[in-house]
Amino acid sequence: MDEAYYSGNLESVLGYVSDMHTELASISQLVIAKIETIDNDILNKDIVNFIMCRSNLDNPFISFLDTVYTIIDQENYQTELINSLDDNEIIDCIVNKFMSFYKDNLENIVDAIITLKYIMNNPDFKTTYAEVLGSRIADIDIKQVIRENILQLSNDIRERYL
């Protein structure tokens, strides 16, 4: 799919957009259906593992994050932005993104998770911040925010990126 997106072939691009649109809608419905059955500790652990590039795609919310990450990654803006920052700016970014976890806004939470995933692609930051990241996220309960906002966020992502 990624090659089709970059090839410039209109038919391939339209197929990619349609596939991602369908996948995002489908996974959003699965998240709504399954979110109550997922233990909060497991959800938080899976979020940390997603950020650290070890995804449990059996967790529907992690599958949702993976799909959003794939869609947004096509834009490459995030990678360019992260790569342009020095270490102090990245640390500031990490601190600012953590604040998003304490707000009842799923878009900000998903943005924070995906940005942290980009940052943790750097082995130096992964080594330094993995433990702190895990302990901070372990204290957060975002299931209610997910339940209430997943459909709207899914629609917003489709409108913005697809």
Curated annotation (Swiss-Prot):
Pfam families: Orthopox_A49R. It comes from Vaccinia virus (strain Western Reserve) (VACV). GO terms for molecular function: protein sequestering activity. It is found in: Host cytoplasm; Host nucleus. It comes from the Viruses. Coiled coil: none annotated. Keywords: Host cytoplasm, Host nucleus, Host-virus interaction, Inhibition of host NF-kappa-B by virus. Interacts with host BTRC; this interaction inhibits NF-kappa-B activation. This is Protein A49R. GO terms for biological process: symbiont-mediated suppression of host NF-kappaB cascade. One of its GO terms (cellular component) is host cell nucleus. InterPro entries: Orthopox_A49. Its main location: host cell. Plays a role in the inhibition of host NF-kappa-B activation. Interacts with host BTRC and thereby diminishes ubiquitination of NF-kappa-B inhibitor alpha/NFKBIA. This stabilizes NFKBIA and its interaction with NF-kappaB, so retaining p65/RELA in the cytoplasm and preventing NF-kappa-B-dependent gene expression. Belongs to the poxviridae A49 protein family.
